[in-house]
Regions:
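Catalytic-domain carbohydrate-binding cleft regions of carbohydrate-active enzymes
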Residues: 1-150
Length: 150
């Protein structure tokens, strides 16, 4: 885990500091410091990230060669699909994975637009035909992710 985990209230060190102190990183941010239930969820996604090492490496290589972002708007990958130009709450991770996270509190399912083609739900292997909007379950421990099939 990266970043800053408060709360804390540290007075400014001098007039160049707006509070928080220099080099302060907040509270512990290791996976296990968030409690057992959260650890289980974060560990699952950490393991998925490790298993995608080669894919992620290739995305970084592509980015260094032609500037393609790792995280892409839907219209970046599907410029001819007018619906993809309207989507704000789902994205592509590289050219293969469509990610549809939850953005709203107490929401446990969501609509996901699948562009043309065939898409596999990475959680259960179910295959969907693209060109449609589906309803995807999204319990607290499961982010809807769909892999574009060749």
């Amino acid at each position: 885990m990266h970043g800053d985990r408060g709360p804390y209230n540290i007075p400014a060190l001098d007039d160049r500091d707006w509070g928080g102190g220099y080099l302060h990183t907040g509270q512990p941010n290791e996976l296990w410091s968030y409690g057992e239930e959260n650890y289980r969820i974060m560990k699952k996604y950490y393991d998925i990230r490790i298993s995608m090492h080669d894919y992620i490496r290739d995305l970084y290589k592509e980015a260094s060669e032609n500037g393609s972002p790792l995280i892409r708007t839907m219209f970046y990958e599907f410029p001819d699909d007018k619906k993809c130009w309207e989507l704000q709450e789902q994205y592509m991770f590289g050219s293969e994975y469509l990610v549809a996270p939850i953005f709203h509190l107490n929401e446990f399912e969501r609509e996901v637009y699948l562009p043309e083609g065939r898409w596999e739900d990475t959680r259960d292997g179910k295959v969907y035909e693209g060109g449609q909007t589906i309803r995807a379950a999204a319990p607290i421990d499961s982010i809807p992710v769909f892999k574009k099939m060749a």
